[in-house]
Amino acid sequence: MAIEFINLKKQYDLLRKDIDRAIKNVLSHGKYILGPEVKEFESDLSNFLNVKHAITCANGTDALLLALMALDVKNKDAIFIPSFTFASTAEVIPYTNATPFFVDCDPDTFNMDITSLERTINFSRRQGFEPSVIIPVDLFGLAADYKNIKELANRENIRIIGDSAQGFGSKIHGKYSSEFCDIVTTSFFPAKPLGCYGDGGAIFTNDNNLADDLL
């Protein structure tokens, strides 16, 4: 017997009445772009993560790119990402003319290793780059080591974008990633912890200025 990775048809069968009613409501009011459902969803996300601003977008890849643009990264900036992650984490960086630096992962968690991160930051400086942004990636529902990453980032004056596409809603030391990061991003691709039918993404921040830039 084959078991599908994700069975949206089965899910729809279970939620059919609610989904059909929601679609009918949208068709009735006719506000297809940034309608009331979007604002309600953003408010629910914001309340769930206890974060000031939740801004939805097309997908998780766009969320990462928009986050980097909001932080005004540029040529010769070094962006630190784990070596074990989905392609999107790396592929958005060249669009900003910055350079990705890959950080080794902890063999027990597969998340970014703090010792390797510090070593890679020092290496980037020796290569003539300016350490700019760390992008830890939550993986398999497990939050990255945000406490130690935040302490290192504060010492080095580096900003943090948390990629929570594969760990949305996870906590570490009793806190969501949004409490450690300048910006957090997520994806609503169907296979993600909070998935949609199609694709979608969101950006979270407690910084009013960053939120204004993203809007």
Predicted region positions:
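PLP-dependent aminotransferase-like
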Residues: 69-155, 159-164, 171
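Phosphate-binding glycine-rich loop
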Residues: 30-78, 92, 102-104, 126, ...
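Conserved core segment of the aminotransferase class I/II
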Residues: 190, 194-215
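PLP-dependent aminotransferase class I/II
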Residues: 9, 21, 38-43, 51-54, ...
